[in-house]
Amino acid sequence: MDRVVLLLSVLSLGVSSQPITDSQHLFSIAVSRIQNLHLLAQRLFSNFESTLQTEDQRQLNKIFLQDFCNSDYIISPIDKHETQRSSVLKLLSISYRLVESWEFSSRFLSGGSALRNQISPRLSELKTGIQLLITANQDGAEMFSDVSALQLAPYGNFYQSLGGEELLRRNYELLACFKKDMHKVETYLTVAKCRLSPEANCTL
């Protein structure tokens, strides 16, 4: 709880007009948070994969590559070039929606309850931080639309009692999509932070 209060008190500085160094500091906090979440996602995925037979891993990976994540409905840059051309506000907007899309879904992740229980509060922290960064970076030329305008429905089989191969596939899909989305958010926030430094090389 203390960590959340500290984050909010620090990030709230961004709501007022501050020098570029303050904005960079706020972004540094957000980037640190998403790096931690991405690491947790990788560990959960690795833990789950370690319980599978080699052939099961191969088949599930093949299926996943042909399937879609729920968050694919969120319009985002298609490659690194488009990412680099996107505005800071756009990257923050997409990051917010990606994080928000996992607030409910993350409760169903496999791979270890000790790690999974860390994810929900950290997603909430990051979501709050990104919202404050969005407010700090809005101007008359580019206004951010309501972040709650797009609400993704949960995965279709969340409420179904699954077993065997279907349960295995759902668990693999959730973990793979979560890892993929946390990587996206880490990339977008890192580029957005870099864009505030005119002398920096933001090449991906």
UniProtKB/Swiss-Prot annotation:
* Keyword Chaperone in record: no
Which stretches are transmembrane? none
State the UniProt keywords alphabetically: Disulfide bond, Hormone, Pyrrolidone carboxylic acid, Secreted, Signal
Please give the InterPro entries that the UniProt record associates with this protein: 4_helix_cytokine-like_core, Somatotropin, Somatotropin/Prolactin, Somatotropin_CS
Recorded hits in Gene3D superfamilies, A to Z, give: 1.20.1250.10
Q: Which cysteines are joined by disulfide bonds?
A: C69-C177, C194-C202
Residues that bear Pyrrolidone carboxylic acid: Q18
- What is one Gene Ontology biological process annotated in the Swiss-Prot or TrEMBL record? positive regulation of receptor signaling pathway via JAK-STAT
| Coiled coil regions, renumbered to chain | none
Q: What does UniProt give as GO cellular component? A: extracellular space
Q: Which CDD domains match?
A: somatotropin_like
UniProt family annotation: Belongs to the somatotropin/prolactin family.
Function comment? Growth hormone plays an important role in growth control and is involved in the regulation of several anabolic processes. Implicated as an osmoregulatory substance important for seawater adaptation.
UniProt name for this protein: Somatotropin
Tell me what gene encodes this: gh
